[in-house]
């Protein structure tokens, strides 16, 4: 969906099935690094959690490969839906050589949860400093030793050593920003303006939906998927129609 708004080149870490499907596409370089997707980070066995971490570590391989090719990298989890282009002011920040990384806070307003799972979400970030990545990888490899939540929690410690920028709330919009009594009212800020989804007074850029594969338990974010799909159905936006056709 990002390609509806921006010209993109991709490096993806994937399994054999995805490799066969995507490696023939001109602007995608596939790294066949994933052996199994029998993994999870929530309600899972220890073996599944270990497999989850193996998958998570492959994203660092993809990021480093992309940085070697292009000098910087915007990383995205595969379950992102872009509904507006990245704003020009943010594009200017991404190209600023004085900023080492751009990262996304969870913004749950639920401090005990963030103390456990991390202040930042690891599903979207931009990086240009290889030392940033090296430190993140080193801490992630030792996540059990330090009691970190997989590769995600180390991010909040690494960013302290660099010039980092927090992307605003209209980026990487996940269900966790709406799921407490104190934050549920944020759903009312999602609305249609000029046939586009807005989050308050800013265009909603992308949603992190957790919906592209079966997960074996209740998808706690289904309410957000339903919300954005219902909003898209009320518009005449051709890009949204393509997203809905893909999902349904």
What are these regions (language model features)?
Residues 1, 5, 62, 151-158:
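Amphipathic alpha-helical segments that form well-ordered structural scaffolds
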Residues 1-45, 68-70, 224, 230, ...:
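N-terminal anchoring/stem segment of glycosyltransferases
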Residues 6, 70, 99, 162, ...:
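Short, well-ordered alpha-helix to beta-strand connector turns
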Residues 27-36, 46-50, 177-190:
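Charged, often glycine-rich, active-site loop that binds/positions anionic groups
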Residues 55-110, 127:
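GT-A fold catalytic core of metal-dependent nucleotide-sugar glycosyltransferases
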Residues 95, 117-119, 197-202:
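Extracellular/periplasmic catalytic domains that process cell-envelope and extracellular macromolecules
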Residues 111-124, 147:
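A recurrent flexible, glycine/aromatic-enriched loop bordering the glycosyltransferase active site
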Residues 124-223, 246:
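Catalytic core and acceptor-binding pocket of nucleotide-sugar-dependent glycosyltransferases
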């Amino acid at each position: 969906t990002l390609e509806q708004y921006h010209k993109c080149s991709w490096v993806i870490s994937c399994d054999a099935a995805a490799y066969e499907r995507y490696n023939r596409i001109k602007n995608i370089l596939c790294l066949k690094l994933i052996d199994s997707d029998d993994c999870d980070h929530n309600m899972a066995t220890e073996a599944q959690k270990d497999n989850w971490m193996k998958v998570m570590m492959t994203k660092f391989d993809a990021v480093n490969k992309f940085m070697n090719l292009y000098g910087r990298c915007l990383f995205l989890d595969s379950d992102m839906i872009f509904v507006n282009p990245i704003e020009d002011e943010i594009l200017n920040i991404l190209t600023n050589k004085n900023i080492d990384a751009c990262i996304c806070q969870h913004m749950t307003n639920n401090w005990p949860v963030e103390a456990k799972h991390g202040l930042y979400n690891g599903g979207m970030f931009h990086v240009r400093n290889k030392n940033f990545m090296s430190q993140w990888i080193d801490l992630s490899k030792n996540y059990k030793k330090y009691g970190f939540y997989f590769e995600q929690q180390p991010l909040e410690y690494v960013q302290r050593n660099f010039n980092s920028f927090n992307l605003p709330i209209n980026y990487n919009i996940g269900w966790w920003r709406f799921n407490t009594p104190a934050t549920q009212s944020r759903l009312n800020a999602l609305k249609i303006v000029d046939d586009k989804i807005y989050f308050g007074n800013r265009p909603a850029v992308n949603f992190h939906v957790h919906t592209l594969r079966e997960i074996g338990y209740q998808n706690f974010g289904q309410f957000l998927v339903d919300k954005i799909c219902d909003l898209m159905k009320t518009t005449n936006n051709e890009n949204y129609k393509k997203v809905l056709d893909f999902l349904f």
